[in-house]
Amino acid sequence: MPGSAKGSIVDGPDGQPVGSRHIAQAFANEKYFQPRPSAVDYNAAGSGGSNLGASNPKLRERVVETLKGRTEASVPADAVTTSGSGLDPHITRANADGQRDRVEAAWAKQLDPAKVKTEVTAALDAATFRPLGGLVGGDPLVNVLELNLDLTKRLAGR
């Protein structure tokens, strides 16, 4: 795994480090895809999952809050649940597809909507992979940081 001994740091368009491909981070800008919710507020020093059980009203409140802004009929579980570490850098392709309209609308405020749609599709397709090359099944995944950096290169770098 090249780079893993150095933390798998990913550089942004300016060559400066922007994150690690193995640790989720929040993206505040509506132009970007969002990772799974984090029980530890994306704090890599204190990783951990939520201990809220299915019968806990606080879990329901958090899920309801997270669902705001999602318009698809069936929201993927990873859009509203935390991972065991709270730092999973991947989301399912279904989760990413559910965020598409918001991301495309945000970029289309400044750029041609048709171009935005084409570039978002290309970025999603390039970022999508299956764990272990699809040998064991599982949902297609997307690395959120790498997807957002590709979007920046495709849409803001022009």
At which residue positions do the language-model features occur?
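Soluble extracytoplasmic domains of inner/organellar membrane proteins
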Residues: 80-158
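Flexible, solvent-exposed loop/hinge segments and secondary-structure transition points
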Residues: 1-99, 103-106, 130-131, 135
